[in-house]
Each structure stands twice: as structure tokens, then as C-alpha cells.
A protein has these predicted regions:
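Helix-coil modules at protein/domain termini and other flexible surface or pore-lining loops
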Residues: 1-143
Length: 143
């Protein structure tokens, strides 16, 4: 079940393998998902979700979804993180310019003391001849 882009307070990130053991086959789960698909041969596809985590564990963070054609995984991942950080920064009263370099943004985070960090999950692929390709990236909530 796709949900909003809010990272609930107190959420912890856990690796995929132990998380999968917590979800029985066929279970309905909550997620924030990005998906991109095409059947155009040679087309570069990418899907990414980015997370921005606040320093205050009682506060909520943000999760962004981003999908594109022609971007590398690194470009899409950085963009997804920037989107999530910009959403969180706006709610915390931090002036955040997505066009600044990562080093400048990291310094803003450090000085503000309000954002712990960002991360992303990204998948990319090139469409093969005579086929259809879908890339998917998701944050899945385990309760």
C-alpha cells in the first residue's frame, strides 16, 4: 500500500535481508515507492527514493520519490536525497537551496543541528532489445 512521504518518528533503517524475514509471503505492507518503465531499446531508466532524517527522534522526516530517463543511479540518488532534505528543511525553518553543492548543503545540516543525514535507495537499468524493463525502488515499513 503506497503511503505519503512522511518518515514516522522513531523509524529505524534495517537491512533488506532481515526485513524480508519480518514480512510473510502475501502480506500487505506500507511503502513509499518509485517506479520507471519502458520498452524503448537502449533507454536508461532509474527509480530512487531518498530519505531525510531529523536529529530529533520524536520528529518526522521525509521520503521522496524520483524516477527519470537518462540519469545515472548516482544522479538520481543525489536528487532524491536533495528533494527529501529540502522538504524536511522547509518544515524546520532551514534555508535550503537544492542547486548548491553537496558540501555546502552538508555544512548547512551540520550548523543547523536539525538534520542528521540523508540516504537513498536507487535502481537503474538499460532496456534491452525486444523487451520491457521496469526499475523499482522502495522504502518498506515493517511493524
Amino acid at each position: 500500500v503506497q503511503v505519503s512521504s512522511i518518515l514516522p518518528p522513531g523509524c529505524r533503517f534495517i537491512p533488506k535481508t532481515p526485513a524480508i524475514r519480518e514480512i510473510p509471503p502475501g502480506a500487505i505492507t506500507f511503502c513509499v515507492m518509485s517506479r520507471c518503465c519502458s520498452n524503448e531499446p537502449g533507454r536508461l531508466l532509474v527509480a530512487s527514493v531518498g530519505c531525510a532524517v531529523p536529529a530529533d527522534e520524536r520528529a518526522y522526516g521525509y521520503i521522496s520519490e524520483h524516477h527519470a530517463f537518462g540519469q545515472t543511479g548516482r544522479q538520481a540518488g543525489d536528487h532524491a536525497e536533495d528533494l527529501a532534505a529540502a522538504m524536511l528543511a522547509s518544515t524546520l525553518g532551514i534555508d535550503f537551496n537544492v542547486d548548491e553543492s553537496w558540501d555546502e548543503k552538508r555544512e548547512i545540516f551540520r550548523i543547523s543541528g536539525k538534520i542528521v543525514g540523508t540516504r537513498n535507495v536507487t535502481q537503474s537499468s538499460i532496456v534491452k532489445n525486444n523487451g520491457y524493463t521496469t526499475v523499482l525502488a522502495a522504502v518498506v515499513f515493517v511493524f
